[in-house]
Amino acid sequence: MGKALLFSRGTIEMPNNIRLSAIRNVIAIFLLLTLCATAIGAGEYKPVFENSADFPLMGDWEGKWIDPHAGHEKHNPELAAQLVCLTQKQYLVRILPKLNVRSVPYLEVKANVKDNMIVIDQAGWKCTFANGTCKGTGRLHGKDVGIELKKVERLSPTLGQKPPKGAAVLFDGTSFDAWQHNDGRKVTWSLLKSGTMQTVSLFWDNKQNQKKGLGGDIVTKEKFDSLKFHMEFRYAVEPGKRGQGRGNSGLFFHGIGEVQILNCYGTPGYWNECGAFYKHEPPKRNAAAPPLQWQTYDVEIQLPDKNDKKTKALVTVYLNGHRIHYKFPMSYTGNDGVSIGLQDHINALQYRNIWVVSHPSK
C-alpha cells in the first residue's frame, strides 16, 4: 500500500516526493498536448498534385502472357495491370485481361512497396514491378505461365483540344470572369500560375474557410441551350483516403443532373463513381485515369424544344475519349437553358481548358 494522504483543516496535503511527482506529471501532460497541437497544425493534410516521380509504380501497365497453353489467352495473350496507391507504403495490385473493361481480375492483392519496387508472391503469382517493367509468372488454367508488362501512360485523345470558332471560353487559365459561386459571390477558388483553377473548400471540415467566406460550389453566369462541352481535370494523390473521400467533385448541368468526378481509379465504376450520372446510372466502363494525370470530359446535350415538357434531354458523355453514355435520357427541369457547375466536395481538384459550344434546341 502506498503512503496515505495527510488531511489538515479540510485540505489535502501530500508528502514532498508525491507533490513533486504530481507536478512533473502535470507539466509533462501540458507539454505533450502542446506538441500534439503543434504537430497537427504543422502536419495538416496536403494533397499531392506534383512530383509524379515519387509514385513511379502507380498507374496503368500493359503486356502479355508468354506462350499461354490454353483458354482464350492462347488466342489473345493480352494482359494488363492497375497499381493503385493506398498508402505511402501499400498498393492495390490488380492484374486484368484488359484495361477499361469490367472483367474478373486474374489477381487482386495488396502489396507493400519498398525502394520503388513491389514483389508479388501470392496466390501462385510470382512477379516484380520495378523500373517500369514487370516480369515473372502467373497462374493460368492450373499452370505457371510467364508474364511481362510495361508501365504506360494513356492520355485522352481530346487532351489540350482548343475551343472551336464560336465557342464560349469558360476558363482559359487567366480569370474566373465566366463564373460565380452559387450564392452570387465572386469566385474564391485558387487561380494557379500554371493556368489551372483549384478548388477551395467551404465544407464542414474547414472552419477557417467558413469564417473567411472562402470556397463553395461555382457555376457559370451564363446559361446554354443544347451544347457541346469540353473540360480537363485531375485529382491528387491522397494516401489513406478511400471511396467517396478521395478526389470527389462533380460536373453539374443544372436542370439535368450531375456527372460524377471521383478518384475511382481501379474500381468497378459504380453509379456513384467517376463518369456516373450520380446515383442514377453507372458509366458503361470505368475509364478513370490514375491520380496526377490530366483527364477529359466531353459532353453533348440535346435539350428538348422549349415548349415540350415531356421529352427528356439526351446526354452523351466521353471520359478520356471513352464513350460511357450515349444519348442517355435525363429529365430536364429548366426552361431557359442550363448553367454549368463545379462542385466543392472537400477534396482538392484542378481544372483547366473549359469551353462550350451552344446551339438552339430544335
Q: How would you name each of these model-derived features?
A:
Residues 57-60:
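A glycine-anchored, Pro-Gly-centered beta-turn/N-cap motif
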